[in-house]
Amino acid sequence: MQPETSDQMLYSFLAGNEVGGGGYCVSGDYMTTMQSLCGSSSSTSSYYPLAISGIGETMAQDRALAALRNHKEAERRRRERINSHLNKLRNVLSCNSKTDKATLLAKVVQRVRELKQQTLETSDSDQTLLPSETDEISVLHFGDYSNDGHIIFKASLCCEDRSDLLPDLMEILKSLNMKTLRAEMVTIGGRTRSVLVVAADKEMHGVESVHFLQNALKSLLERSSKSLMERSSGGGGGERSKRRRALDHIIMV
């Protein structure tokens, strides 16, 4: 008997050849093929949970990496802001760019204390800012701060108000290599009082510089008085200003 061909095997399966119990007769080759397919399907199904688990782990790792990158970026921006503020403080206090943070913050605390003390000392004299009827000069040695290399002076000038008074004051301070830290000016009824807090380099100035500043301000007042008298002596009448005042030279050291 010749072996069945594949067409005959398929026909036998479809025709349903009966076997003693009325079942179907299926060839061994066909059953082997079906079992192979079933086995492959089972293997594929068992693979899917592992693949899904791997995807979940990958997503968790991606989220962790994204959170880490965000944290690093936030930390970088925070450090940039801190360094920017520190550089501004270095510029305000005239510190070297290499000054470390601890030294810089110590200088800031010291400067704040100095300003607080100056505020307390000057608050008592606020009522005396109003200009008087007498020309006055007052020059004080206001403080000695060796840490930042500057010596502080306080100068007060009361005289007739004129448009070029402030430029003349600035020119005097510039000629003496002094820098203005604070300035207050009050003008009432043609009279003005200027109170200046100035700083000078300790390598160029000492306590004796009080006299240099005082003499420069005295010269300024004398020029101002002379100019005022010349302007008030208009025409041929020679009438002098009724507001002419003598110079009371007050020096406090």
Swiss-Prot record:
UniProt keyword Ribosomal protein, yes or no: no
Chief localisation class: nucleus
UniProt organism field: Arabidopsis thaliana
Assembly information from the UniProt record: Homodimer.
InterPro entries attached to this UniProt entry: AIG1-like, bHLH_dom, HLH_DNA-bd_sf
Protein's name according to its UniProt entry: Transcription factor bHLH106
Molecular function GO terms recorded: DNA binding; DNA-binding transcription factor activity; protein dimerization activity
Gene Ontology BP, a term: hyperosmotic salinity response
Compartments reported by the entry: Nucleus
Entry keywords, A to Z: DNA-binding, Nucleus, Transcription, Transcription regulation
GO CC list: chloroplast envelope; nucleus
Domain bHLH: 66-115
Keyword DNA-binding (UniProt): yes
